[in-house]
A protein has these predicted regions:
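C-terminal accessory region of radical SAM enzymes
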Residues: 83-85, 90-94, 153-177
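Conserved AdoMet/S-adenosylmethionine-binding subsite of the radical SAM
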Residues: 1-144
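Short amphipathic alpha-helical segment that frequently serves as the phosphate-/nucleotide-binding helix
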Residues: 111-114, 152, 156
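A hydrophobic, small-residue-rich beta->alpha segment in the mid-to-C-terminal subdomain
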Residues: 144-151
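Radical SAM enzyme core and accessory elements
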Residues: 173-190
Length: 190
């Protein structure tokens, strides 16, 4: 994000006054140089890992280099914060939780994402948040293959592979894929 200098400035002002982990919630498509600026400021990274196949990334996100960029970014995040650590209260104190949202008709890409994460960083040190709440909005009608919610079969296929790979983390209930759980994104109140 282009706001990193302002984020660092704000964190400098509260350094030593906060007793909570600093969490960086990101879409994952980040420059390594930007992430290096955050070293020492962030305790927990929450990146998305959306696509394995760059053709899919190009089609839906106009990011034909998505896979290379996100892998480099998550690698840098892992270098900075290392393995997930929890306090005596059971809350995460540092580490990475990678989020992945399964898209309709793309379960094989989701499985490839999980296999890549397991291959590069293992399943012991990084947590996974496997999400099922995809709801077709915005321009999804331009892409018939994603203009519906994911099926139970699709999500369960990805969930099964996550379990086979040994991932720990949070596997979302498919029932969360309802409109009432999706923000309006209308910028009201901003």
């Amino acid at each position: 994000t282009h706001f990193v200098p302002q984020i660092i400035s704000a964190l400098e002002r509260v350094k030593g006054k906060l007793n909570i982990p600093i969490v960086y919630n990101t879409g994952g498509y980040e420059c390594v140089e930007t992430l290096k600026m955050l070293e020492g400021y962030i305790d927990i990274y929450l990146p998305d890992f959306k696509y394995y196949d760059d053709e899919i990334a190009l089609k839906y996100s106009a990011a034909g280099d998505y896979f290379e960029v996100v892998c480099a970014a998550i690698g840098e995040m892992f270098r900075q914060v290392g393995a997930a650590e929890f306090g005596g209260d059971g809350l995460m104190k540092k580490g990475i939780m990678i989020r992945h949202l399964t898209l309709p008709n793309h379960r094989h890409d989701s499985i490839a994402v999980l296999e890549e994460i397991a291959s590069r960083w293992g399943t012991e040190d990084i947590l996974l948040s496997l999400m099922s709440q995809y709801t077709p909005f915005y321009r999804s009608s331009e892409f018939p293959e994603i203009s519906r919610r994911i099926s139970t079969f699709e999500y369960n296929s990805v969930l099964k592979r996550a379990e086979e790979l040994g991932f720990k983390g949070f596997m979302q209930e498919k029932s969360s894929a309802k409109e009432e759980y999706t923000p309006d994104f209308d910028l009201n109140g901003i």
